[in-house]
UniProtKB/Swiss-Prot annotation:
InterPro entries linked: Aldolase_TIM, DAHP1/KDSA, KDO8P_synthase
Organism: Glaesserella parasuis serovar 5 (strain SH0165)
Catalytic activity reported: D-arabinose 5-phosphate + phosphoenolpyruvate + H2O = 3-deoxy-alpha-D-manno-2-octulosonate-8-phosphate + phosphate
GO terms for MF: 3-deoxy-8-phosphooctulonate synthase activity
Record SUPFAM superfamilies: Aldolase
Enzyme class at the top of the EC tree: transferase
Intracellular or extracellular location(s): Cytoplasm
Assigned keywords, A-Z: Cytoplasm, Lipopolysaccharide biosynthesis, Transferase
Protein name as catalogued: 2-dehydro-3-deoxyphosphooctonate aldolase
UniProt EC number: 2.5.1.55
Domain of life (superkingdom): Bacteria
């Protein structure tokens, strides 16, 4: 099957090309922290020769509790994103939750993300697609990999063929997630070769059934990421934090920023090895 390539300047995103790291922090906590985190990612990825896109949210609109930190909001968030681009020359991915956000966000960032909980909201999907920006679709935890083809079709029907698909885990009973490793290739197939990436951080969430925030399994981030990279993917989606225990969102799943270089080095080694193999057709 022919694999599609999406180009962002000098970055090529495709299942059969070197993986792209979509990395940053869960939510913009401050301008200074965003600068610190982005600088570290840029240093590490440049040293290792890994293509890089910065990620963060300006508004976590789906927090469990009304009292939880959501972010600085769109206006302030876009200012921070623009400063990161001007300072480090990075490409940026962020999510939108409302139709009115689509166009102004697409004018600043390079990839706009369709959140998993909103992935079947047709009006939002259409508004995002019509910006002409690259769209990253998070697979809903409740949706099978095979159903992702319908979301891709919605976007393409609006005249936008720049679609990335992202797996962030699948419901496993109540308050738990698992990753279906066979699902990555299903998504490649039903999307006719769209780039598929793996959000390892959010796949590690494990909720307290009566709590107001997600727990996580940070100690397993490297092992789960290794397994995903062995499939042969277009990219890895990762959140890191200088002090995960003090993060304002999803700290229990975040990689300590100090471990970033060792982590990315291992992912690159696996990606290089897997993509050096010749494909073996076992379908007949």
């Amino acid at each position: 099957m022919q694999q599609k390539t999406i180009s962002l300047g000098n970055i090529d995103i495709a299942n059969d090309k070197p993986f792209v790291l979509f990395g940053g922090m869960n939510v913009l906590e401050s301008r200074d922290m965003a600068m610190q985190v982005c600088e570290k990612y840029v240093e590490v990825t440049q040293r290792l020769g890994v293509p890089y896109v910065f990620k963060a949210s300006f508004d976590k609109a789906n927090r469990s509790s009304i009292h939880s930190y959501r972010g600085p909001g769109m206006e302030e968030g876009l200012k921070i994103f623009q400063e990161l681009k001007d300072t480090f020359g990075v490409k940026i991915i962020t999510d939108v939750h409302e139709i009115y956000q689509c166009q102004p966000v697409a004018e600043v960032v390079d990839i706009i993300q369709l959140p998993a909980f909103l992935a079947r909201q047709t009006d939002l999907v259409e508004a995002m697609a019509r910006t002409g920006a690259v769209i990253n679709v998070k697979k809903p935890q409740f949706l099978s990999p095979g159903q992702m083809g319908n979301i891709v079709e919605k976007i393409e029907e609006c005249g936008n063929d720049k679609v990335i698909l992202c797996d962030r885990g699948t419901n496993f009973g109540y308050d738990n997630l698992v990753v279906d490793m066979l699902g990555f290739n299903v998504m490649k197939k039903v999307s006719k070769g769209c780039p598929v990436i793996f959000d390892v951080t959010h796949s590690l969430q494990c909720r307290d059934p009566f709590g107001a925030a997600s727990g996580g399994r940070r100690d397993q981030v490297t092992k789960l990421a290794r397994a995903g990279m062995a499939i042969g993917l277009a990219g890895l989606f990762l959140e890191a934090h200088p002090d995960p225990n003090k993060a304002k969102c999803d700290g229990p799943s975040a990689l300590p920023l100090s471990k970033l270089e060792a982590f990315v080095s291992q992912m690159k080694a696996i990606d290089d090895l897997v993509k050096s193999f010749e494909e073996i057709d076992t379908s007949n």
